Amino acid sequence: GIFISAEGIALGHALSLTSQQIWLLCALCAGLLLALAIRWLLTPPAALVRASHVETSLPASGSDTRRAAWRLLMVYGLAGFGYIITATYLPLFLSGSLQSVDPVHLWALFGLAAAPSCLIWHKLVLKWGYRQALTRNLLFQALGVILPACSASLLFCVLSALLVGFTFMGTVTIALPKAKSLSHQVSFNMIAAMTALYGVGQIAGPLITGALYQIAASFNPALCAAALALLIAAGLVFTERQA
């Protein structure tokens, strides 16, 4: 979806379409994808039906797992803040510095990297385990976030798009099953709380970026803050006691 929308916008720019016409083009693409999704929901593949009936075992109760639940909430909120600045402002990092390349193509790379990421990170969780997989995911994400602050070159921005695109959905893939396994340890809906905190991070990111940009006239302070948030999240995961 990210890839299609980005390339649709780039096509609109190349054809000198107005913003209203580009919005209509994006709406057409969304409508086609919605039709496919509705058809899939009405006749789900047999594999999805079987998977929906698979029961998962609950871990043993105790103070350690309760602490793990609260720690995961903090990690997820920090992750929401950490990725959103790059995801929001990525094309602007190259805006005005390229003559013949539309910066919106960076969004296409972001989407291409995200497309297979959930499947890959799921396999990596099975191989490495939750703690190592999420720690590495957040560290790679932090690296991708900080790269444009080191250099606004095309290479660094492309690497940033690929790294953040490949890892941000991986964070969700790794964290939500863990949240489900810990949900019985808290008195509220764990998945809902995680989604809310992730959203708070997503809202706070652009607001803080705007404030810092007014002070420094640069995205670098916000990128450093986002990378720091991801490093703190990685540290919280890495130092968690293993059951």
For each feature predicted by the language model, list its residue ranges:
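Helix-loop-helix hairpin linking two adjacent transmembrane segments in secondary transporters
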Residues: G1-L42
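Multi-pass alpha-helical transporter architecture, strongest
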Residues: L33-L42, C224-A243
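A membrane-interface helix-boundary motif in multi-pass transporters
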Residues: H13-C29, G210-L230
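Structural signature of the two symmetry-related core transmembrane helices
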Residues: Q132-L147
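A late C-terminal transmembrane helix in Major Facilitator Superfamily
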Residues: L182-S218, A226
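Helix-to-loop junctions at the C-terminal end of transmembrane segments
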Residues: S117-Y130, Y213-Q214
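Extracytoplasmic gate region of multi-pass secondary transporters
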Residues: R67-A108, A115-P116
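Intracellular juxtamembrane helix-capping segments at the cytosolic ends
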Residues: M169-S183
